[in-house]
Amino acid sequence: METTDWSALGFDYCKTDWNVRYSYTDGKWSPMEVTQDEYIKMHMSASCLHYGIELFEGLKAFRGVDGKVRLFRVADNARRLQSSAERLCLPVPSVEMIVDACVEVVKRNERFIPPYETGASLYLRPVMFGTTVGLGVKPAKEALLIVYCSPVGAYFKGGIKPIRVAVDREQDRAAPRGTGDVKVGGNYAASLLSGEKGHELGYSNIMYLDAAEHKYIEECGAANFFGIKDGKYITPKSPSVLPSITNMSLRQLARDMGLTVEERHIPVEELATFEECGACGTAAVISPIGFVYDMQTKAEYSYGEEVGKTCLELYTRLQDIQYGRAEDKYGWCTVVL
């Protein structure tokens, strides 16, 4: 990989050497299989192809300032994968299985881990789906769990920058008591139409409100939302919001900075009172929000063209832990190499 232009990497698939697989048949998981095959042979009547019995995860490995390679909160991603599997009535792999697979993938693909100074990282994608052959709607009795990886570039080229976001009440991300709190493919498929509408109008993301009343902020694109005001870090509390591992981390770092953390309903009109706000997730860590436009009420909320002080400090503190520049006092990182 000596000739790779790491700075040119985006967030896209890049072929690596190895992936790891487990199959579930006859009531038990197979031993780990390590393969270079990028393809899957699947029956046309496999349940995942017809009934959306599919889930995935996303996490990163970072080459640190000290040369060590760290996986960030891999056990938390494993536990969230278990929750998604339970929700879809899929067989539930153990945390140990998932963590072992992630560690193996990082070790096997060491040459694809970007150098420290590039700001890039190795993205891991665990994906699991039902493979039972049939026609009717029923839980899958066979499944496949794969973990693969791809090097990805820094989300913001040239430094963290605010994004433009639009509120759209005409599309909902997830129904109340639906699957919004688990990481399943259908949630993302359902967001594509409104996302494309927003992109056509010049917005990076759509801000989704609660599906029941369309009063409260839920998610921002495929990321959690948070707002900063009066010394508080405020983020939505809702059973249809995915529990973001990045948001969990930022809440702890906010407390470390002396902020009060509130998890509660956030009326969309409260956007007018925030000093800063942002979207957070694995891909970007934090995407500061510079402008919000409400498509239905025509209200506009502006937070400036530069990243706010609190967002920048939160971003820096988390990246410092991920890249080994700061003490990992909460034990979030697993040193792999």
Task: Show which residues each predicted segment covers.
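Helix-start/capping segments and mature chain N-termini
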Residues: M1-V105, V127, G134-L337
